[in-house]
Amino acid sequence: SADLATEIEFLMARARAVGTAHANQVLTELELKARSYAVLSLAASAAKPTQRELAEFLSLDASQIVALVDGLQDRGLIRREPDPNDRRSNVIVSTPEGDELYARASDKVARAEAASLSALSLEERDQLRSLLSRVAF
């Protein structure tokens, strides 16, 4: 039988759990969690994603996205705007307040990532990022 600690699927799941826990910890004082941070990050990007695109990119159920978007919108951090390419759907964009909070949150997440990956050299971090991107996308 294979040793669980050497199975790639288990290692990726464990790394995700550890990373999410670290992100949630540093985002607590901003009243964000990893998932709401991810939505805010995409809303602050130039992509202007629809809720469906958010769900696909984040591998979440549509109802989970609605709850996340509603929560961020209630806080004045994002807003729904009609999609100029499809009036039947909305794009999700950040507000100025959302942009400011995202900048603060992004800094906290970057520092947490650096701490979590401190055992790796910068070259190893770049290699890890590249490999994970290939697997994820």
Role assignments for model-derived ranges:
Residues 6-10, 30-41, 52, 63:
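Short alpha-helical elements of helix-turn-helix
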Residues 10, 14, 38, 127-130:
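Amphipathic alpha-helical interaction segments
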